[in-house]
Amino acid sequence: MEKSFTHIEAGRARMVDISEKNDVSRLARAAGEIVLSAETLEKIRTGTVEKGNVFATARVAAVLAVKKTPETIPMCHQIPITGIDVDFEIGEEAVSAVVEVRTVGKTGVEMEALTGVSSALLTVWDMVKSAEKDEIGNYPHTLIRNIRVLEKLKGKA
């Protein structure tokens, strides 16, 4: 059976009508990572990044992005967000971010979780870009990767 796109009807984009769906608990967790130099990772680890606390700033950015997802993803519904958790981990070559979003609503929150992760990682980049630039101002080794949905739950979140 061929899958069809729910947001496209007769070749035009549209917002899916969810009015007949029941409100249920929903949860989505998304993750991603940003590859950084060993020197930059050490600055984050020791709290010596010139712009300030990288994770505190990126956490706020993730929360704001989750709440504003319908403003940047055209077919996303405005839904009540009941909880957001943002976690970071410093690895050997990268910082990992995980964003968990919860709601009681008619549609899932995976786009909100993905948007939160993306914004968190972009904010990490912004906070450390002066340390990551090469001599001509480029970022030859900085890389955001592996942004994905880890988990999506409906009815038992």
Swiss-Prot record:
Give, as one word, the top-level EC class: lyase
A GO molecular-function descriptor: cyclic pyranopterin monophosphate synthase activity
Gene3D superfamilies, A to Z: Molybdopterin cofactor biosynthesis C (MoaC) domain
Q: What is this protein called?
A: Probable cyclic pyranopterin monophosphate synthase
Active site positions: D126
The record's InterPro entries line, in alphabetical order, gives: Mo_CF_biosynth-C_arc, MoaC, MoaC_sf, MoCo_biosynth_MoaA/MoaC, Mopterin_CF_biosynth-C_dom
As for family, the record states:
Belongs to the MoaC family.
**Matching HAMAP family, A to Z?**
MoaC_A
Catalysed reaction, written as an equation: (8S)-3',8-cyclo-7,8-dihydroguanosine 5'-triphosphate = cyclic pyranopterin phosphate + diphosphate
Pathway noted in the entry: Cofactor biosynthesis; molybdopterin biosynthesis
One Pfam family it belongs to: MoaC
| Keyword annotations from UniProtKB, A to Z | Lyase, Molybdenum cofactor biosynthesis
Name the Gene Ontology biological process terms. Mo-molybdopterin cofactor biosynthetic process
Q: What does this protein do?
A: Catalyzes the conversion of (8S)-3',8-cyclo-7,8-dihydroguanosine 5'-triphosphate to cyclic pyranopterin monophosphate (cPMP).
Q: Where does substrate bind?
A: M75, C76, H77, M111, E112
Protein's organism:
Methanosarcina mazei (strain ATCC BAA-159 / DSM 3647 / Goe1 / Go1 / JCM 11833 / OCM 88)
Q: Write the Enzyme Commission number(s) for this entry.
A: 4.6.1.17
Tell me, how does this one assemble? Homohexamer; trimer of dimers.
